[in-house]
Structures are given as C-alpha cells and as structure tokens.
Amino acid sequence: MTKQTLRIALFTGLYSPFLTGVSVAVHQRVHWLLEQGHEVFLIHPQINNKFSKQVGKRPMAGLEELQSFANFSSYAFPTEPLIFYKSLPQPLHYRHWSDTKLLEKFQPDIIVVEEAAQMRGLYSAFLQGYGRPVGVDYAKRTKTPIISVFHTDIVAYIRYYLGDFLFGLMRPIIPLLVKQFSNAYTLNIFSSREQLSKYQKLECLRGEYVPYQGINCEKFHPRNICYDPIPNDKRPTILFVGRITAEKNVTQLLDAYPLIAAQIPDVHLVIVGSGPLDQEIRRRAQKFLHGVTLWGESHGTELLGWFARADVFINPSVTENFCTTNNEALASGTPVVAAMAPSTTEQVTVGYNGFLAQPNNAQDFAEKIIAILQNPELKAQLSAQARPSILEFDWSVCSQKFEDKLYQLVGIPQIVKSSS
C-alpha cells in the first residue's frame, strides 16, 4: 500500500530570508509535504535589491534545502518593501504577474494560500499588495479546492495600531471585510480554537480548526542547554524572542524589568530579534546597564540554547495566533509568562506550565515572573511540566492533520494499492 500523492500549489506572502514565524512554518510545512512524496509548487516573495543586504544574508533554511527534492518547484513573485515595515515584502499588483497563469501551468490538485490577507494588501491598508484574492480566479474556473491558512490576528493588529477610538469607528465594516475575505476560499483554517471563535463572530465563513501549527519537539528540547550562549553567566534569565515591533508589545518588557529587578537585583533580561523598534528599545535599555541585553537575531543551535537556558520566557504580545515561540520555549522546558489573549489560553495552563498576565500590565507581568524566580520549587515544577504540555503539537502530528485535511478537500483516498 502506498500513499496517494498530491499536486499542491502553495502561495505564501512570507518566506526565507524574510524572518517571521510564518516564513519558518511555511518552510517546515513544504519540507514535510515533500518528504511524503507530494509534488509542491511554492510561490514565494522575491528578494531583490530594494531590500537591505542584511535581509538577504540571514542564515535561514530555505530554497536550497527544498531544491534537493525532485518533486519540488518554485516561483518568486515580484515584490517591494512593505511601506510600514521595510524589511518585509509585499507582492506587486496582479498587473505585474499572474497567479492564474502559474496555476494553469502546474495544474494543482489543491491550492494553499498562507497569509492570504497580507498578499492581497491588507497589511498596507490596500496601498500595496496583489489587489485580488490570490489563487481564487483559477480555483473557481477549474473547481479546484483552495484553502486559506490563517496566521495573523489582523483585527488585533488593526486595533493595536489605530487605537480604540479609530477602531471603534472602523468596527462596523470589519465583519464585512472578514466575510468577503473568507468567502473567497473553500476553507479557512485556524490553528487556534479561540481565534476561530473570534472570527466566526466577525462573520468568517467556512472556518475550521485544524492544528497545523506545530513545532519540532525533538529539535527544541531541554538538552539544548549544551548550546548555552552565555554559559559563564549564572544570573536568572528572562527571555523574549521575536520581532522588535510595536504589535509585539516589546516596550512592555522594559516597563516590567525594573519592577522585577527591584526584587531580584541580578535578574537578566535578554531580547532576541530585530525590527523597526530596535533603536528605540536599545536607547531605553541603556539605563539598565548590563541588566538588559539586546542580542539581535539568533539562529541555529545558538537560538536553541537560548530557549533551553532561560528561566522564564516572557511574551507580552496580545496579537498572537497560537504563538510559535511560546511552544518552542515550552518544548525546551522553559515556563512561559504570556499576555492573556485568545490563543495563549490554549498554550499556557496557569500554574501548570506558566502564567497568564493581564495585557499591557507591567506590574502583573513582574509579579508573575517574580513568583517563579523566587520559588525554586515552583520553577522546577513548571519546568518539568512545560515540555509534556506541548507534545501534542509536535510538528509531525500537526503536519499529518494538515495532510488529512488536504486529502479530505481533494476527495481522494490517502492510501492506494501499490502496483505490486
């Protein structure tokens, strides 16, 4: 018996060397599908001279790794920098390239669109982007199933950047936009039950929970302490890993730090990542001298070492959708203190593998972290329970569920009799 292979066209608005959680997840997903024998056509953003040289030099797994598979092909669509975030791409308008022509040539069994709203132009308030739902024209004409993979809580982003007043003015049209976006696709899949519920209340059509967003639990592991980037530093370590942007609420880290340091003077806050707020955060961190380290980007075993070394992982963002770094920390045996948001309640069980803090409340974050660091018995208990709590989201398990959904939508059996 052998597995029936599929021809899968996968569009993504973000991919290596553009560093985001979406980019990393897409690469892992495509790699896994190729390992299963499926033919994958990856349509991804082009890296060109409009972006800084630093972007193109990131040591990320990408096309070179996938090109070793005979069943892989790709196309880099033309891009320009996102006007609000110059290190991330936006596709050029459909006048410049045709998703339909690409699909006509490949003739997929199913189309997957990752971060569909971003590709269409929502991240730039429609000032940029493709200008129409990606892949939908071909899907409708050929009756090919097409799914949208939901990554970003866009409504939370809108509220965060516009503020409550402007968001209140815009709120009446949000359900109309959500309904229009979701109606274009055969299925819209969410990795968080709470996020699905939120968007269903906003008129999302054909939404379904599929736990596609896993992590490699064999890769992220407590044993990675052997890769500790600062092995001679014995201070208790609070770790943040992510983009240094406003929506990640990174400034909350520096609001909470002095409150923690007042109780634990030798505490060390390490911020790993880069982004538009990098210089502002560095300027603010100067007053804490050696208590706060802005490490910059981290990759490979060094990053694994940070997750395993940390005593507590902190995530103040309220815009996450089943946050990957939360899971990576837990798999590494590190308790998490995260902002209370729809998806974090599915990752963090209060008092079991970490704590949830009130959003935008530095005092509450500080109290939760102090409680862990001042109580070795509690810290040991949370650490011991962190990894088992997240094993159900191992990458292989989640990828299998994603593949099952593809077979269901295509309507062919997974297993066929071998010719022998």
Question: Where do the model's predicted regions map?
Answer:
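Aromatic "clamp/platform" in nucleotide-sugar-dependent glycosyltransferases that forms part
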Residues: 318
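Donor nucleotide-sugar binding/catalytic pocket of nucleotide-sugar-dependent glycosyltransferases
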Residues: 168-224
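Conserved donor-binding/catalytic core segment of Leloir-type glycosyltransferases
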Residues: 229-258, 270
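Conserved acidic donor-binding segment of nucleotide-sugar-dependent glycosyltransferases
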Residues: 350-351, 355-362, 371-377, 391
